[in-house]
Swiss-Prot record:
This is Probable NADPH:adrenodoxin oxidoreductase, mitochondrial. It comes from Dictyostelium discoideum. Belongs to the ferredoxin--NADP reductase type 1 family. Keywords: Electron transport, FAD, Flavoprotein, Membrane, Mitochondrion, Mitochondrion inner membrane, NADP, Oxidoreductase, Transit peptide, Transport. One of its GO terms (cellular component) is mitochondrion. The lineage of its organism: Eukaryota, Amoebozoa, Evosea, Eumycetozoa, Dictyostelia.
Length: 515
């Protein structure tokens, strides 16, 4: 019997049975009471090969060993954000790739990877549903949040932080991006770890440590040649409300040859009562700010080091060119300055939580490139699948998709895992637990035959994918990926680094065909 922890002890709905004991849902009550083994054919398609998809595959395989699981991936390689979203200088975090890879290595007949398949573009989602008993959506969240201010869409050199990290990591879909690092002043809007990733990597200019990672040589060379000297991290909230984790904030505040400043020292003046209400980790974050952030000093800033300047309680309200315009007309199409509004925190009457509102006071800082890292809006990726833009997730109960938000009616055979299930946040361990819950619901539905296709035969499934694609479409299986990886490791050794990622798709195809 498998126990899955959840936040509340309400019963599953619409025929999904369970036994409930306080905060623990004990699933499979009926199936655990019999010694009979269900051998009904089961073809499962998982869309997305990141941690959510692979963890779900492993946990379903453990519970339904004879299941045929096909994992579809838009990119030509697996592992999702582990390969393309974790900062190159955080190799310890990337080691989870070894665990994920075992899912594909140890069960090659039951769990099969097919890369370079873009749903709707290469194959219709409806065809997937027609050829599998069940489908799990585990491909993450698309759609970065915009600032929604004048100049954001009209001036050049305004980017998303996530694209920059993908570019550094050799993610194919980000290689066409051009990032201007030719000027001294750069700003990052956001108070989460991705904002720190961008700043930290730029501050590690000429770092041998960074050079030896899996960062692409192209992007490493560009960072080394950059003229960036002053990096501004801007956030609408105060130092007590940031989303930085202690490990990341400590790392960036203790970098060698970096001056760490705060633009407005008064923003660190917070009441002892407010500090006392913080969780332990948040208290430590605030202590780190007080310990390392000094009032901006121009003389120190000119000492040859790079400068990191934190701006708390500030919101960008307009992006300006060198003429002070946000229209982007004529030769003034390039970002030059940011207009910021000073904020103050008030208690929201509805939520009783602090929120930042503008004070009507403004200031302007020099800035020639801007990275946005303020969250995700989400996009509706699949026809006929509902999407809740408020929670930035697909509405579901314990991983089974609902017909609409707050509904009590399920869509049989359709499941969700990872960020699409719970919203765009959560560590790898959280995603593992998230996937466990989804796998449990799939197992229970398998026992009761509540799927898209209830036919008890083994038609369709993995073997149907190639027939549904165009004849000349290049699919990439796991053996193909291992050829790519082998070549990347070889090229990396030649350069004295972990690996050298291949960033041109045609080159990937040639490696596969000629190996």
């Amino acid at each position: 019997m498998i126990n899955v922890l959840i936040n509340k002890s309400s019963k599953l709905v619409n025929g999904v049975d369970s036994c409930i004991n306080n905060k623990t849902i004990r699933l499979f009550c009926s199936s655990s009471s019999t010694n009979q083994v269900n051998k009904t054919p089961f073809n499962l398609c998982i869309i997305g090969s990141g941690p959510a998809g692979l963890y779900t595959a492993a946990k379903v395989h453990r519970q339904i060993p004879h299941a045929n699981i096909t994992i579809l991936e838009k990119l030509p390689y697996p592992f999702g954000l582990v390969r393309s979203g974790i900062s190159p200088d955080h190799q310890n975090e990337k080691k989870v790739k070894n665990t994920l890879e075992k899912v594909l290595l140890e069960h090659p007949h039951q769990i099969q990877f097919i890369g370079n398949v873009d749903i709707e573009k290469d194959i219709k989602f409806q065809y997937i549903k027609d050829n599998f008993h069940a489908v799990v959506l585990a491909c993450g969240i698309e759609g970065d949040k915009k600032l929604g201010i004048p100049g954001e869409l009209t001036l050049k050199n305004v980017y998303f932080a996530r694209e920059f990290i993908g570019w550094l990591n050799g993610n194919l879909k980000d290689q066409h991006k051009q990032f201007d690092l030719s000027n001294e002043n750069l700003a990052i809007v956001g108070q989460g770890n991705v904002a720190l990733d961008v700043a930290r990597l730029l501050l590690k200019k000429n770092s041998d440590e960074l050079k030896k990672t899996d960062i692409t040589s192209t992007s490493f060379d560009k960072i080394n040649k950059s003229n960036v000297k002053n990096i501004h991290i801007i956030g609408r909230r105060g130092p007590l409300e940031v989303s930085f984790t202690n490990k990341e904030i400590r790392e960036i505040l203790t970098l060698q040859n970096v001056n760490t400043f705060i633009n407005d020292i008064s923003t660190l003046d917070v009441s002892e009562e407010d500090v006392s209400k913080l969780e332990r980790a948040k208290k430590r974050t605030f202590e780190l700010f007080k310990q390392h952030l000094k009032p901006f000093d121009q003389e120190i800033a000119n000492n040859g080091n790079m400068n990191l300047i934190f701006h708390f309680l500030r919101s960008p309200v307009e992006l300006l060119d060198k003429y002070g315009s946000s229209s982007g007309s004529g030769d003034g199409m390039v970002l030059s300055k940011i207009k910021l509004e000073k904020n103050k925190l008030i208690i929201d009457e509805k939520t009783q939580q602090k929120k930042a509102i503008g004070s009507g006071e403004f200031e302007i800082i020099e800035c020639s490139s801007l990275f946005r890292s303020i969250g995700y809006t989400g996009t509706k990726q699949f026809p006929s699948v509902p999407f809740d833009f408020n929670s930035v997730s697909i509405p579901n109960k314990y991983g089974k998709v609902l017909e609409e938000p707050n509904s009590d009616k399920f869509i049989n055979g359709l499941y969700v895992s990872g960020w699409l299930k719970g919203g765009p946040s959560g560590s790898i361990p959280n995603i593992s637990a998230n996937s466990e819950e989804t796998a449990s619901i799939i197992h229970q539905d398998y026992e009761s035959n509540q799927f898209i296709n209830n036919n008890n035969n083994n038609d369709g499934g993995h073997n149907s994918i190639t027939s549904l694609l165009q004849p000349n479409h290049k699919i990439i299986n796991f053996n193909d990926y291992k050829k790519i990886e082998s070549e990347e490791v070889k090229r990396g050794k030649e350069k004295g680094k972990l690996l050298e990622k291949i960033i041109v798709f045609d080159e990937l195809k040639n490696i596969i065909n000629n190996s």
